[in-house]
Amino acid sequence: VPIQKVQDDTKTLIKTIVTRINDISHTQSVSSKQKVTGLDFIPGLHPILTLSKMDQTLAVYQQILTSMPSRNMIQISNDLENLRDLLHVLAFSKSCHLPWASGLETLDSLGGVLEASGYSTEVVALSRLQGSLQDMLWQLDLSPGC
C-alpha cells in the first residue's frame, strides 16, 4: 500500500471521527479550554508533534471512551483503534519503532468520576478529543517525526 494512501486514509478517518463528534449535539456546549475539576486526566489541547505522542493521546481517549456507557462512544472508540493502526503503519514507513501505547494507569478512579459526572466527562472528553484530532490533522501535513 503506498504510504500516501495510508496518510490520506488517516486524514479521512480523522475527519470522520470529528464529524461523528459534531453529530453528538451536546459537545458544542463546552469550550475545550474550560477547566473542569476532577477531569484533569483528560488530555488538554497542546501541540501533538510526533506520531508516538499522537498514539499516546489516542490511547488515553480510547480508554476514557470505552469506560462510558453511551453507544456513540463505542463507535468513536473503534474509530480511534483504527486510527491508531494507521498511525503505526505511518510510523513503520518512517522506520520508527512505535510501542503500543496503553493509556493511563491512573484511570482506576474513572468509574467514580463517571458515576458522579458522566455527562460532563463525556462532553469535555469529546470536545478535547475533537480539538486534538484537528491538531493531528494539521500536524500530518507537516510530516511529523517519530
Curated annotation (Swiss-Prot):
SUPFAM superfamilies: 4-helical cytokines
Family that this chain belongs to: Belongs to the leptin family.
Gene Ontology annotations for the cellular component aspect, listed alphabetically: extracellular space
Annotated compartments: Secreted
Species whose genome carries this gene: Pan troglodytes (Chimpanzee)
One GO term (biological process): negative regulation of appetite
Domain of life where this protein originates: Eukaryota
Single GO molecular function: peptide hormone receptor binding
Taxonomic lineage: Eukaryota, Metazoa, Chordata, Craniata, Vertebrata
Disulfide bridges in this chain: C96-C146
Function: Key player in the regulation of energy balance and body weight control. Once released into the circulation, has central and peripheral effects by binding LEPR, found in many tissues, which results in the activation of several major signaling pathways. In the hypothalamus, acts as an appetite-regulating factor that induces a decrease in food intake and an increase in energy consumption by inducing anorexinogenic factors and suppressing orexigenic neuropeptides, also regulates bone mass and secretion of hypothalamo-pituitary-adrenal hormones.
Protein name: Leptin
Keywords, in A-Z order: Disulfide bond, Obesity, Secreted
